[in-house]
Regions:
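RNA pseudouridine synthases
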Residues: 2-299
């Protein structure tokens, strides 16, 4: 196989995990080359889902697209220990950030942020180029973010956020067990003078917030929970889980105990949204951090 991969598609004939399917159908590719396709984000499922896991389950009838490495070279120019580009076109960027890395600057820190790194990257294509913030993740949270490449796209995303954003999913490890296996946490959130958020069951002038949850598994004192935002308030998931007596492990600001894996156990691993300019449905997933499995392992 040459170093330049042209775009083509392969139909799935029987259920199989991704790497097993690739090894069987792409016999001209070495194992290393197949792994390279995965690591360089060149594999897509049915034209919508970027494949990031070697064991992603495929179903008979699915279509796996292998996209040209030439289209990925622009992405590969950005190399940063705390940040990876997942998708990029002329309008948007989708990136993954590690925990402990700021989305935007603060009074104390301006440079070590996703925003600054992406802005510097954009300037390599022209001094007039810049990036535009669409939404944020807390410093302590790892996960996926979408940025705009123009004011027009930023406004299109933000003004139509509830219409365009179809799903945002998080995974958390909490201390304790939620009252039900599935449910919705509802509360009004307000901020005190120390910039700490609080939850109230009654309307006290705060912002109404809803978080849907599903318990994925439990082990000892810990539970792994998948969460979906119905609203997007500051620290919403963190304060909601604290309000029901199940604070996120490592989240000392909101009642969490010390983390055995040395991090706040919250990960924004799924984004599904309609592209603001093309109308295409975009779906991105980033695997749950392997360290989470040390506390609760879910098959």
């Amino acid at each position: 196989m040459s170093d330049t991969v042209k775009q083509f598609s392969v139909r799935v004939l029987k259920d199989a995990p991704l790497m097993e399917f690739l090894a069987e159908r792409l016999k001209d590719y070495s194992r290393t080359q197949l792994k390279s396709l995965l690591s360089h984000r060149q594999l897509w499922l049915n034209g919508e889902l970027m494949l990031t896991r070697h064991d992603h389950p495929l179903k008979a009838g699915d279509r796996v697209d292998i996209r040209s490495s030439k289209t990925m070279r622009r992405n590969q120019k950005l190399e940063h220990s705390q940040l990876k580009v997942v998708f990029e076109d002329e309008h948007i960027m989708v990136v993954y950030k590690n925990e402990g890395f700021l989305t935007v600057g603060t009074d104390r820190e301006k440079l070590q942020t996703v925003y600054h790194v992406l802005n510097q990257y954009m300037k390599t294509f022209g001094q007039d180029k810049r990036i535009f913030v669409v939404h944020r993740l807390d410093r302590e949270t790892s996960g996926l973010l979408v940025f705009a490449k123009s004011k027009e796209v930023q406004e299109a995303l933000q003004s139509n956020w509830e219409t365009l954003m179809k799903e945002r999913s998080y995974t958390a490890i909490v201390k304790g067990q939620l009252p039900e296996q599935q449910g919705v946490i509802k509360a009004y959130l307000w901020e005190d003078k120390q910039l700490r958020m609080h939850a109230s069951e009654t309307d006290n002038g705060g912002q109404y917030a809803e978080t849907k949850y599903s318990v994925m598994g439990t082990k000892g004192p810990y539970s792994m929970v998948q969460l979906w935002l119905k609203t997007g308030r500051k620290n919403q998931i963190r304060v909601h889980l604290q309000s029901v007596g199940c604070p996120i492990v490592g989240d000392k600001k909101y009642g969490g105990s010390a983390s055995p894996i040395k991090r706040v156990c919250l990960h924004a691993g799924l984004l599904t949204f309609k592209h603001p300019m093309t109308g295409q449905m975009m779906h991105f997933e980033w695997p749950i951090p392997s360290s989470f499995n040390k506390l609760v392992r879910v098959k």
